[in-house]
């Protein structure tokens, strides 16, 4: 794909994800306030990087990305639930997310907890409902298994728990990497891995794509830490320097700003190399990789 | 089964569930405090009525209940997560559960939220991991789909959200029944339905067992409300009359105590009738039904 058509592809897919997410909430028969709270955070915007990784991987393997749409939405629901719960007063106690009041600020803590619980549970339902002809039962089961592992007590939840436990302590680089590999890495990796499963990647492609995603995940987090120091407040939608003032371990704090930038470049290069080795139509994935390296919010 | 062997069967199954639950947590590679928080509430006791309903239904259909054990544990994990989240300060704000300090009292709010999130996610993983030979992929997918529906934003989470919204308001009987059918009913019904799926029930048996479970679920809740008035504090492990003092809608409040007892008897009889109509070896299910009618905690 040419650069222009890559951008167009990603814009179209992002739109498809956002339309599908809204429909999935609309069709629910449940208390109105619960639906509103779930929709509020799902529709609060964001880069939709996880669904786009999945859909771009499916596309890179020559399959119709529409087949992966429900799984892409499931991933975004789980990502969104994690943001809602992370923002709670007893967790990170954030009032703003993407420049808007956080879920509990609008709907109250109880409803925010329930909206998160609802999104997490609903995500699994979406994958079960896909037609057997589009994704066979055994592959859907594998998709659910890997999603639960990526999101659960050996994945994202483990990362968040380690993050909570590490607050106020001086972390080593390996402890910091444990947190990031779990808190954000596992779900980013899952996004690509699920795309490989849906797209029918062979063993070698799957291995290279998994490596691509692992490096991309670390790059993503390092960039996040750098942005916290360099980014403009209005662009990232939260107070700049909040990590420093919260005394949180970050890559720049452990490696210096220059060292963090070097590490970012290393992981981006490694990601691009593994992507090339995967021998897929990876233009959209390469473009996402560039966006992560250069993103300013 | 004779009465004695029924009691023995249920005790053995309860033991099997508790052993399996502990093993499932032990095997996790994750932060120690997260595992402790998850295990604490899982191991806090309770009647294990949901897993026992599932395993007794599998047994009633002539199959080995061991086949259903991972699904029984998944149900108990989801039930336990819901208790942890319901007890949080922003929800019911309970300090005691089964006579022991609630999860957030011991591990803090953040870890309690994460323990709940972890249990919910892990529950789905357990079902995916069952061998194809024991439960085929298409049935496992159905089990996951129904579990997500029973627990999610059209099931248990909807009931809890409606309950939160109804606090301090005067509810009608139909609003109260909506809350109970969702908050506790859906998961009790799922327990029997999952047993029917695993045990290979035919359409008529499934229908009768579903009806059995629906009536049992309502009976369970009515008995709970009656206990809140009549029960001894040390037996139920929370202050007696807490519903009244919290101004919560209950069956006795809406129907009088005598009216509630009449309704309890009606649902127990209907449950037993549907169980007989299912033409299964239902001794253990009938016994659980009697326990619900007579339970004093």
Swiss-Prot record, chains A, B:
Pfam families cross-referenced by the UniProt entry: polyprenyl_synt
Key words of the record: Cytoplasm, Isoprene biosynthesis, Magnesium, Metal-binding, Transferase
Impact after mutating residue 73 to F/S: No loss of activity
EC category: transferase
Cofactor note: Binds 2 Mg(2+) ions per subunit.
Catalytic activity: isopentenyl diphosphate + (2E)-geranyl diphosphate = (2E,6E)-farnesyl diphosphate + diphosphate
Main location: cytoplasm
Binding site for Mg(2+) 1: 86, 92
Residues that, per the record, bind Mg(2+) 2: 86, 92
GO BP annotations, alphabetical order: isoprenoid biosynthetic process
Keyword Cytoplasm listed: yes
Cofactor: Mg(2+)
Effect of residue 289 to F/S: No loss of activity
One cellular component term from this protein's GO annotations in UniProt: cytoplasm
Gene3D superfamilies tied to this protein: Farnesyl Diphosphate Synthase
Subcellular location: Cytoplasm
EC annotation from Swiss-Prot or TrEMBL: 2.5.1.10
UniProt entry tagged with the keyword Nucleotidyltransferase: no
Family designation: Belongs to the FPP/GGPP synthase family.
Name assigned to this protein: Farnesyl diphosphate synthase
Protein source organism: Geobacillus stearothermophilus
């Amino acid at each position: 794909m040419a650069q222009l058509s890559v951008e167009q592809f990603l814009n179209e897919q992002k739109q498809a994800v956002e339309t599908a997410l809204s429909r999935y909430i609309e069709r629910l028969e449940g208390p109105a306030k619960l639906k509103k709270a779930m929709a509020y955070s799902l529709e609060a915007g964001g880069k939709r990087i996880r669904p786009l990784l999945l859909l771009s991987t499916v596309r890179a393997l020559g399959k119709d990305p529409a087949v992966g749409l429900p799984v892409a939405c499931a991933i975004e629901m789980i990502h969104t639930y994690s943001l809602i719960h992370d923002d709670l007063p007893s967790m990170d106690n954030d009032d703003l997310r993407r420049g808007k009041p956080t879920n509990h600020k609008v709907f109250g803590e109880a409803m925010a907890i329930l909206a998160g619980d609802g999104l997490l549970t609903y995500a699994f339902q979406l994958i079960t409902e896909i037609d057997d002809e589009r994704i066979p039962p055994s592959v859907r089961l594998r998709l659910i298994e890997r999603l639960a592992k990526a999101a659960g007590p050996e994945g994202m939840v483990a990362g968040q728990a380690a993050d909570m436990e590490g607050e106020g302590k001086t972390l080593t680089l390996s402890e910091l990497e444990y947190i990031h590999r779990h808190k954000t890495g596992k779900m980013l990796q899952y996004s690509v891995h699920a795309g490989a499963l849906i797209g029918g990647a062979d063993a070698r492609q799957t291995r290279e794509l998994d490596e691509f995603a692992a490096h991309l995940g670390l790059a993503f987090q390092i960039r996040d830490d750098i942005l916290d120091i360099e980014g403009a407040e209005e662009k990232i939608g939260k107070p700049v320097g909040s990590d420093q003032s919260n005394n949180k371990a970050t890559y720049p704090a452990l490696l210096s700003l220059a060292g963090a930038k070097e590490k970012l470049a290393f992981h981006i290069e490694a990601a691009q190399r593994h992507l090339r080795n995967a021998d897929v139509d990876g233009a959209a994935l390469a473009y996402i990789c560039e966006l992560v390296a250069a993103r300013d919010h």
